Amino acid sequence: MQLWTRIRRYPRLGLILLAFIAFVALGLPDGLLGVGWPAIRAGFGLPLDALGLLLTSSVAGYMTSTFLSGFLLARVGVGRILAVSCTLTGLALLGYTFVPAWGLLVALGVFSGLGAGAIDAGLNTYVATHFGEGLMQWLHACWGVGITLGPLIMTFGLSALNTWRFGYRVVGGFQLLLGAGFALTLAAWSQVPATAAADAPQRLTDYRTPLGATLRRPAVWLSVLLFFLYVGAEGGLGTWTYSLLTEARGVDPTLAGFFAGSYWFTFTLGRVAAGVVARRVGVNKLVLGGLVGALLGTGLLLWNPGELANVAAVAVIGVSIAPIFPALMSGTRTRVGDRYAANTIGMQMTATGLGMAAIPSLMGVLARQFSLEVIPLCLLAIYVGLLAIYTLTLRGPGATVAA
C-alpha cells in the first residue's frame, strides 16, 4: 500500500518500476529457447541447425525496429511504442504455441523481434535521457533476471506438463499484461521532462560526424567486431548449453535446465556486482578480467571431468562475461574518439543483432556436422579472439585520441 502511495505521489518511480519489469520481460523469451529447442525441433521434425532460421527471423525484426527507433520515438512517443511493442511481442509468443507448421513459427519470429527491438531501444533511450547512467546498470540487470527465469519456466513446463508451449504461453501472457500497463500510463510517459542527467558528460550526439568518416576508421571496425563476437558467444552458450548437456553428455533434462539457468543467474549477479565496483576497477580491468575468467570457465567445460564441473563451468563463464558488454559500451568513446562515438554505438548495436543470429546458428551447423562437443571449442576460439582484438584496441590511435 505504501509503495502504491509513493508511486502516485512520484510518477517517475512508477515509470522506473515499469521499465524494470519490462526488461525482465525482455529477457524471458531469450531464456526459453535454449531449453525448449530440443522439444520444439522434435515436435516439428527438424534438424539440429534449424534453430538458425528462427534466430535469423527474430534478429531481422529486432534490427529493423532498433534501426527505426529514433524516427519512431520522435514521432509516436515512447509510451505508445512500448504499449504496441509489448502487445506485438506477446501475441507473437502466444502464436508460437498455436501454429501447425514450422514456417509459420519462423514468420512469427519476425514480429517477436520487431517488438523486442522497439522495447529495448525505447527503454534504453528513455532511461539514458531521463534518469542517467546509474539506473541504466540496474535496467540491464533486470534483463538478466528475466533470462535467468526463462529456463526455469521452460524446465517446469517440460518436466511437469511435458510441453514446451507452457513457457511461451506464460511469457506471452505476461507481455500482454505489460502492454496494458504501458497503455494505462501513456500520459505519465509524455509528462516527464526530457532533461539529461546532471552528471552526464558532454553529449556524443552533439557531434555531426558524417557516417562515411566514421567508416574509414579502423578502430571503429575493431570496436564493432568486439560486439559481434561477444554477443554471439554470450547467446551461443545460452542457446546450446541445454542441448550439449542432455544430448551429448547424458545429463538429466531437469538438472540440465538448472545448469542452463545457473549461467544466466551468475550472469545477473556478476552484472549487479560490476555496477558497484566499476568506478573503482575501471573499464579495461573489467573487460580483460572477464575474458580471462571466461577462458578458464570454457576450459573447464571443454575438459568435462563430471556433472558438477559442467555447472561450475557455465557459472564461471556467466559471472565472468557479465560486465563485458556494458564496459565495452562505456569504453566506446575511448576506443574511437568522441567525434565518432555516436555513429559507432549505432553500428555496435547492429553488430549485436548480427552476432546473436550468426554465431549460434554457425555453432548449430558445426554441431550437426561434427557433434555438440564443438560448442566449447567455438567458445574458446571466440574468447581468445576477443582478448587479442581488445588488446589491439588498447594500443591503437583510438585508445588515446578523444577527437
Predicted features by range, described:
Residues 40-41, 72-73, 153-162, 245-246, ...:
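Interfacial helix-cap and linker-helix signal at transmembrane-aqueous boundaries
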Residues 65-78, 270-282, 367-368:
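Helix-to-loop junctions at the C-terminal end of transmembrane segments
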Residues 64-103:
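Conserved MFS/SLC helix-loop-helix module at the cytosolic interface between two early adjacent transmembrane helices
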Residues 45, 77, 98-103, 250, ...:
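Helix-breaking motifs and short loop linkers at transmembrane-helix boundaries and internal kinks
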Residues 33-34, 217-261, 265-268:
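Extracytoplasmic gate region of multi-pass secondary transporters
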Residues 338-372, 379:
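A late C-terminal transmembrane helix in Major Facilitator Superfamily
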Residues 139-190:
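Helix-loop-helix hairpin linking two adjacent transmembrane segments in secondary transporters
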Residues 108-143:
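Cytoplasmic helix-loop-helix junction between adjacent transmembrane helices
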